[in-house]
Each structure stands twice: as structure tokens, then as C-alpha cells.
């Protein structure tokens, strides 16, 4: 959901876990093809709105995320990236950013389902964590969430369909010490399976790409 991101990502296995810890990968071109045509069209038209609430003591602070404690620097960054921002009580910050759910790869021209729905949607939390966060903060104040670009909620049924497609299309392998994995970050999505025992996978990213900024009809 940032206005720039790496096109290349590398993984190096320093120490594989005793059990689990795979890095499942999914072809984002295949995800695009497997999506229901009506749902794909809906995402293309509506896009996505990522909402972040930076609250002291909960998840990441805005100071750590933006690497500054200067509010003016944060505000300038948000304006340049077309991110709506709102300073809240107790030194909190709320941001909203509209991004595509579906993109065209800048080099291959292929259409890809490229987004961070799984990372941000509240339905992807485990049920106990979701219930606890909603009871404490309410949906509006969750640390992170994602909606359709018009602000309407993305249905849990839609997220369940997307998760099922990810599971169907995913490929995983057991890490071995010394393994190197290089991915095109737009063509291939990745995740991480739970694991037992010590595990160390180091990651490097490069070839930063700045996407076209989507102008929002908001003030901030």
C-alpha cells in the first residue's frame, strides 16, 4: 500500500526451522485469472482503501513507520503520496490510502492481483485476536484494515473466496540451509507458514518502482 515498492526480492536461508516455516509462493497472474470475473471487475473499478491507525503501544508507531518524530515531515510525505492523514488524540495518527487491487506489470504488461488484502483485512486475523481488538477499539480504530476504494466493507465471504484461491494456487517447499530464492515481487506473492524451532531467513529487496499515484477526493 506504499507509493513505491521493490520489484525484486531475495530470500536466503541461514537456518531452517525444525518443523514448518515454509515460504509459500503464489503466481499473481494465476490469481488474477482464477478470480471470479465479476469480483475481478469489482476490484478493478472500486480499487482498495488501506486504513492505518498508529496508536502508541499498539502495533507499529507512526514514528517508527515513517522514521521520524517530526509531524511536518510525515505530513509532507503523505501529501506527496496522496495519503489522507488525520492527527488524533494521544499523539495518534490515522491514514487512508487508495491503491489498485489489480495492476499491470511495468515490464511484462501482464495483469496481476497485486495487493496487501491478506495482511490488512480484519477477517485474516485469528478469531480470538479479531474479537479482542474489535471489542477494545471498534472497527474504525483497528491498527490496520482495508476496504473497497469507496470506503464500503469488503465482505468476509469475498475474503474467504480469495483465501481459498491463494491456497489452491500456492506452492511451498522445505527450506534447506544455504537456499536462495529470488522473486519478481509483482508476479509472485509470498507468505510464511508457522514453525517450530529456531528459524532465520534473511530478506533483501531492490529495484524500487514508483507507481502512479491515485488522487483521493479528501482533504489532509
Identify the role of each PLM range:
Residues 4-220:
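Active-site environment of non-heme Fe oxygenases that use a 2-His-1-carboxylate facial triad
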Amino acid at each position: 500500500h506504499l507509493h513505491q515498492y521493490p520489484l525484486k526480492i531475495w530470500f536466503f536461508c541461514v537456518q531452517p526451522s525444525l518443523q514448518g516455516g515454509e515460504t509459500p509462493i503464489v503466481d499473481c497472474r494465476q490469481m488474477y485469472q482464477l478470480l471470479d470475473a465479476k469480483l475481478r471487475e469489482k476490484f478493478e473499478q472500486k480499487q482498495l482503501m488501506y486504513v492505518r491507525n498508529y496508536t502508541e503501544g499498539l502495533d507499529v508507531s507512526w514514528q517508527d513507520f515513517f522514521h521520524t518524530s517530526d509531524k511536518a515531515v510525515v505530513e509532507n510525505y503523505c501529501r506527496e503520496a496522496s495519503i489522507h492523514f488525520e492527527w488524533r488524540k494521544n499523539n495518534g495518527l490515522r491514514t487512508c490510502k487508495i491503491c489498485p487491487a489489480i495492476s499491470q506489470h511495468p515490464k511484462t504488461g501482464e495483469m496481476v492481483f497485486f495487493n496487501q488484502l491478506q495482511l490488512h483485512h480484519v477477517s485474516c486475523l485469528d478469531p480470538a485476536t479479531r474479537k479482542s481488538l474489535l471489542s477494545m477499539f471498534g472497527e474504525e480504530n483497528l491498527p490496520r484494515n482495508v476496504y473497497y476504494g469507496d470506503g464500503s466493507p469488503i465482505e468476509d465471504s469475498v475474503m474467504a473466496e480469495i483465501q481459498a484461491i491463494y491456497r489452491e494456487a500456492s506452492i511451498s517447499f522445505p527450506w534447506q540451509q544455504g537456499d536462495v530464492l529470488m522473486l519478481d515481487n509483482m508476479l509472485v506473492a509470498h507468505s510464511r507458514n508457522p514453525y517450530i524451532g529456531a528459524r532465520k531467513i534473511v530478506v533483501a529487496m531492490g529495484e524500487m518502482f514508483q507507481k502512479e499515484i491515485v488522487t483521493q477526493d479528501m482533504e489532509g
